[in-house]
Amino acid sequence: MAKANSKEDHLIVMTKESELHEGRARIKVVGCGGGGGNAVNRMISKALKVQFIAVNTDKQALERCQADVKVQIGNKVTRGLGAGGDWTRGRDAADESRTELGAVVQDSDMVFITAGMGGGTGTGSASIVAEMAKEAGALTIGVFTRPFGFEGRIRNDTAEEGIKALRGQVDALIVIPNDRLAQVASSKTTLEEAFRMADDVLRQGVQGISDLVTQPGVINLDFADVKAIMENAGEALMGIGHGAGDSRAEDAAKQAVSSPLLETSIDGAKGILFNITAGKDITLQEVQKAAEIVRAAADPGANIIFGVVRDDTMAGEIKITVIATGFGGKTQQEARQETARRTIDRPELGLEELGDINIPAFLRNRM
């Protein structure tokens, strides 16, 4: 189903009905520009239970995206030919299409905005999409990548302009430096694979949060739990860990809290949200061990909330995503100046020392 009144109209294409269910939080993911559209396609391939929206100035790029809703912005500014890497044109295109952008983020409880910073459309439009989502009353979370260093100073400076514009427009801002991906890439990783990794880390950031609300699990969270950590949180950090074998829980948790994606430690964070994804073979002791490690790495007074998501394809494995928030309005650069990464090898905590981790009563009673 397509809607178009004239050649000058903004194009909104509905490709399929949203698969949202009654009684669930209304979650939307908006991919801005080429990188955001690529991330949306990766999320769709992983069957995330959210509504997907693609925003672009480039009509051809939109046609390749598999999003539920596609919004072509800035027809007068770009004539459907893209922003040419100029973030101010991307911003002007989004400004021209405020009405359309406001319409697609209405009736949302949570809106994720994702893009690869440094280009024209994604960098320029993201802050305006965020502004529209906040005005609609949604919990607004930005998940973005910063360009690789080899992409040059201009692209990196452009990214900083986009990130600066986003501060104050989102509840939580997660920025992952692509250069950090080099620390987990092998010497044989191709350039194409590196950019795919950058797209996929955007997917992991969104999925790590949204799955806690939308996916069935041993320990489920609701929207209010996520909102308690993410609302007005400012800049946030994300770490991802994976483990297999006998020490999988410990390995995954340690990787997550000392992840190469983290530009600093999670010391000083006032809120921690973490997702444990595993098959049905996960044990109570493994959940407790993972929680202990995250708790030991966090601020003593941090509000820590977690959920356990079941994924039957992960038998024998555990993946942990940690989101740390509440750094008192500090930027990541300021946080790096105040804290150094610390060793995670801590004494094991007993259950009584986990009192400030939000463990559901039914599970606490079983421990």
Feature names for model-found ranges:
Residues 2-367:
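Tubulin/FtsZ superfamily GTPase core signature
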